[in-house]
Amino acid sequence: MSIVWTDTVKQIAGVELHLTRGGSGPAVLVLHHDIGSVDRLPFYDALAEKFDVLIPHHPGWGKSQRPPWLRSPRDIAAIYAWLLADLEVSGVSLIGLGFGGWIAAEMASLAPRDYAALVLVGAAGIKPDEGEYIADQAIVSYIDYPKSGFHDEAAFARIYGGVSTDQLEAWDIAREMSFRTAWKPYMYSQTLPHLLGGVRAPALIVWGDDDRIVPLSAGRAYARALPGAAMTVVPDCGHFAEMEKPDALAKLAIDFLSRK
């Protein structure tokens, strides 16, 4: 089945927000990593065979405009809640990838009854166990940071090939936005764990067993914080599960969302 994807620009909070949309069925909002979004991933196509898939570029990332006032993932969460209201879609499920998982968790905490389901994949936003840390982009190169998110370096090469100048520039911008919105404390919220207990949406936590960016202990913390959450660990998989193990992640997500 060939999925038709459309690209539009929405004006939200004075920001030109780029939105890719495809498929049909119940709505699913997919929120991308801190390194930005790769267009037309097989994972997205698999979701779009069952769902109406919405993939925005975070404000300041990719093709979306940078708001000078943006300072936190919670700001981005509010923008996306506004986007969904303008699109007049309801009963939306959220899939958050890495940094996007943090945003999805913030959305769910702000509107505990509004979302049909929550899938967090290697999500930032919660502090790992004592002695463990979320990988710091500031101390590695633009290429080494995304590479470290793959269990198998061949998977990185399959997605990115020979890294272009345009890609390096996109990672540079993404890194700047990550620092602007998640610097102190770095990549986690001191308040979020205390606010997730009110979330009514069923939640699935997915983690790669070799995630070297966000430690597995953060996933376990999410599973404890979200009432009744299920957790699955994907073998031979790093942080970027949607790129490294698209079939496995798509099956997990589709099976979970189809039960809701």
Q: Which sequence ranges carry the predicted segments?
A:
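Conserved alpha/beta-hydrolase catalytic His-Asp/Glu region
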Residues: 129-135, 143-201
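Active-site loop/oxyanion-hole signature of alpha/beta-hydrolase fold enzymes
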Residues: 54-95, 251
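Short beta-strand/loop motif that positions the catalytic acidic residue
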Residues: 199, 205-207, 211
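Catalytic active-site module of serine/aspartate enzymes centered on a nucleophile-bearing elbow/loop
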Residues: 229-260
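Flexible "cap/lid" loop of the alpha/beta hydrolase fold
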Residues: 102-110, 115-147
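Conserved alpha/beta-hydrolase "acid-adjacent" motif
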Residues: 212-218
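Acidic beta-to-alpha connecting loop that harbors the catalytic carboxylate
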Residues: 24, 34, 209-211, 236-238
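Conserved HGGG/HGGXW glycine-rich cap/lid loop of the alpha/beta-hydrolase fold
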Residues: 11-65
